[in-house]
């Protein structure tokens, strides 16, 4: 149950990102695709560990 708030917050962050980058990129800007890849990887990790969260040694954010 402690995993659910983290999962919901990440979903809200992903939903609030713009689908089109309206500003010009500079060499220091991180691409939006990279941000989405990181978010997808985090969500996949949460999905994989969600089933084992009730067990103490398996859930790493307790």
UniProtKB/Swiss-Prot annotation:
Record carries keyword Secreted: yes
Pfam families: Chi-conotoxin
GO MF, one annotated term: toxin activity
Modifications after synthesis and translation: Contains 2 disulfide bonds that can be either 'C1-C3, C2-C4' or 'C1-C4, C2-C3', since these disulfide connectivities have been observed for conotoxins with cysteine framework V (for examples, see AC P0DQQ7 and AC P81755).
Tissue: Expressed by the venom duct.
Subcellular localization: Secreted
Maturation-removed propeptide residues: 23-50
Gene Ontology CC terms, in alphabetical order: extracellular region
Name of the protein in question: Conotoxin Pu5.3
Species of the source: Conus pulicarius (Flea-bitten cone)
């Amino acid at each position: 149950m402690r995993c659910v708030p983290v999962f919901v917050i990440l979903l809200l962050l992903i939903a609030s990102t713009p689908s089109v980058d309206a500003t010009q990129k500079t060499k220091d800007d991180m691409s939006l695709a990279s941000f989405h890849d990181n978010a997808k990887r985090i969500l996949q990790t949460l999905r994989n560990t969600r089933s084992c969260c009730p067990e103490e040694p398996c859930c790493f954010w307790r």
